[in-house]
């Protein structure tokens, strides 16, 4: 089968690009013919205040950089290129209404089967006309694969039945990690907050929880690893005001894949204090490194965490509850049992299973 992908791929950085690359690699292993119809430009600088949109990642799969979603003249060029390649299936990565006009234009004109791979249905930030934009982009899809029950529910709530009934529940597979060398003898207990930092991810909630945690675990250390969408000043000010400089280590930058293992190797638990969510690639990354997770019980996060076995779930936007979970994690010595539980479950939810669900 000839399978085309529409959306970001390397050298664009981030979870959407990474997900598409892993899925395309899986289809390639299954002897399908692959073509990545990549973005030439993804966002105007105004919509991407966290710096460079690229990293050093690459792929050996065939890829052409053509589409700029906010430049209409690129839409017809991308459409023609897809049609000339004559795919049997087009998989479009979706996560923001920003792409609705360009995707809608292309998807309703291609002659092959269309699958939308939806990482989100309702965006974390408010967008004017979300329902209309979703309807326009999604109406040409033969199948809409979502990655959590929360997203499937959003799809049914937001779009008319003639579109939403095409929704299919998928999942976020666990990544195959780079080699990880655990450092068993830690100088201090280590928490990790990982990934692109936006307000909805609740880093402020975690920082407010830290003084409570420190009372019970004086040598606790939190590593914050990820670029900030906007300015890091708000978090730097909180760290100073809460007198957390001795307990918080900040790496406000994008971390390429080759460095990711280093941070998980020296962390006991990954914290996701999200205020809202659908699903999270950070969970898949943490599980790939057999790192337990403490996360807010919002959206689809709980679908990927087995409470009290692979992690702990807490109410959102609640620093005392988050602090209590962290303290319990250490007091009850949960780290090793949770790592073992994660290791026993890693063979489920594979890329091969997701690929089968998409093409069946």
Label each region the model flagged:
Residues 184-201, 207-210, 223-225:
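Conserved donor-binding/catalytic core segment of Leloir-type glycosyltransferases
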């Amino acid at each position: 089968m000839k399978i085309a992908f529409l959306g970001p791929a390397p050298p664009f950085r981030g979870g959407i690009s990474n997900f598409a690359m892993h899925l395309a690699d899986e289809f390639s292993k299954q002897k399908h013919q692959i073509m990545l119809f990549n973005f030439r430009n993804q966002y105007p600088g105004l919509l991407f205040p966290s710096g460079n949109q690229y990293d050093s990642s690459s792929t050996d799969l065939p890829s052409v950089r053509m589409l700029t979603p906010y430049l209409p003249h690129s839409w017809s060029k991308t459409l023609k290129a897809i049609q000339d390649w004559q795919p049997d299936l087009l998989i479009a990565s979706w996560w923001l209404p920003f792409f609705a006009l360009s995707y809608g234009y292309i998807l309703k004109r291609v002659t092959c089967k269309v699958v939308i791979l939806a990482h989100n249905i309702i965006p974390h930030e408010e967008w004017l006309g979300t329902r209309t934009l979703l309807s326009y982009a999604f109406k040409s899809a033969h199948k809409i694969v979502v990655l959590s029950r929360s997203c499937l529910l959003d799809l049914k709530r937001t779009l008319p039945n003639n579109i939403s009934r095409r929704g299919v529940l998928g999942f976020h597979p666990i990544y195959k990690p780079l080699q990880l060398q655990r450092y068993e003898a830690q100088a201090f207990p280590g928490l990790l907050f990982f990934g692109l930092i936006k307000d909805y991810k609740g880093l402020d909630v975690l920082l407010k929880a830290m003084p409570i945690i420190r009372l019970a675990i004086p040598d606790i250390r939190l590593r914050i690893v990820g670029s900030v969408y906007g300015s890091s000043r708000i978090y730097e000010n909180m760290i100073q005001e809460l007198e957390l400089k001795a307990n918080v280590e900040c790496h406000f930058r994008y971390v390429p894949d080759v460095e990711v293992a280093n941070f998980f190797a020296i962390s006991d638990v990954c914290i996701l204090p999200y205020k809202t969510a659908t699903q999270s690639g950070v969970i898949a990354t943490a599980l790939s490194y057999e790192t337990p997770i403490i996360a807010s019980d919002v959206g689809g996060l709980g679908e990927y965490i087995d409470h009290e076995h692979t992690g702990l779930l807490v109410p959102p936007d609640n620093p005392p509850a988050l602090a209590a979970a962290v303290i319990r994690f250490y007091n009850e010595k949960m780290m090793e049992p949770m790592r073992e539980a994660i290791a026993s479950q890693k063979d489920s939810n594979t890329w091969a299973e997701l690929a089968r669900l998409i093409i069946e």
